[in-house]
Amino acid sequence: MKKLKVIALLICLCASFTFAEEYHWPRSYFASLGMGAQVSKGDFNERAISGKDTAGVKGYIHPPALEFIATPDLMLGVNLGAFSFAMSFQYWVSEQVIADFPDESYKQDTRIWRFGLEATYNLFYPEFFQVGFGLGYSYNSVKSDDIAIFSSDTYDAEFMGSAVAFIANIHYYITDNISMVPAIKIYESWFKNVHCSRVETNDLDPYLWQSFVLATVSVQYQF
C-alpha cells in the first residue's frame, strides 16, 4: 500500500504541475465504467498451502482456482496531452472451484477485488480514434469461504498481494466527451500473505504467482 501512496502522490503532482505557456499540455479529467471477463492460470490452480496453527496442528488452505471471473472496471483519471493517468477499481463475488480439494466439485463464494494505478500513452492523440499502451501497479485481495481445513474444522481465508499490469486499449470518441474504450489488461500477480482466523496472517514462501488476462469494454466520460 505504501507503493500505491507514493505513485498516487506522483500522479497528483503531475496533474497539478503547470508548464510555461509555450509548453502547456491540454488537461482534462475522465470517469469510466465498464464490464469485463478475465481468465487466469498459475499456482492458485495447482496446489494447496500447508501450515500449522499456534498449537502445532497442521492444516491446509486450498485456494480458489479462479479459472473464469466476470468483473466491473471503474476508473477515475486525468489526461495530460497524449498521456492518461488513472486509478482503477475492480470488485466481484462469484462461485469458484476450490483447487486440490478432495471433492473436485467443491465450490465456494469467492470475493476478488483489485485497486490500482495506471499510466498510458495514446497514439494518434487528439484524433477521435486513439490506441493506448501502458503499465499499471495494483493491490489484490482474494477471499473465499471455508477453504482452510484444520482437523475437521473449516475457516475462511484471504490471499493478499500485488500485480504489475500491461495495458492496451482503444478510444473511439462518439462525441467530444463520450468514448467507447475496449481494453486488454494482463496482470502478473504475486500473493505473499494469507490470512485465516486459525493461523492469523502468514507470509507465503514461496509466493503464489497467478497471471490474469482481463478483457473489458467501458464507456468513458471526459470533462
Where are these regions (language model features)?
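Cleavable N-terminal export/targeting peptides
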Residues: M1-R27
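Residue-level detector of intrinsically disordered/flexible regions characterized by low predicted structural confidence
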Residues: L4-I7, S138, Y187
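Alpha-helical transmembrane segments and their juxtamembrane interfaces
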Residues: C12-A15, F83, I186
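Short glycine/proline- and aromatic-enriched beta-strand/turn motifs that initiate or cap beta-hairpins
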Residues: A20-F85, L214-F223
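Gram-negative (and chloroplast) outer-membrane scaffold detector with strong preference
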Residues: V39, P72-S151, Y155-V164, Y172-D176, ...
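Predominantly the C-terminal beta-signal and adjacent terminal strand-loop region
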Residues: F44-A48, G59-I61, S94, I98, ...
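Extracytoplasmic loops and strand-loop junctions of Gram-negative outer membrane beta-barrel proteins
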Residues: D53-Y60, D100-D103, I149-T154, R198-D203
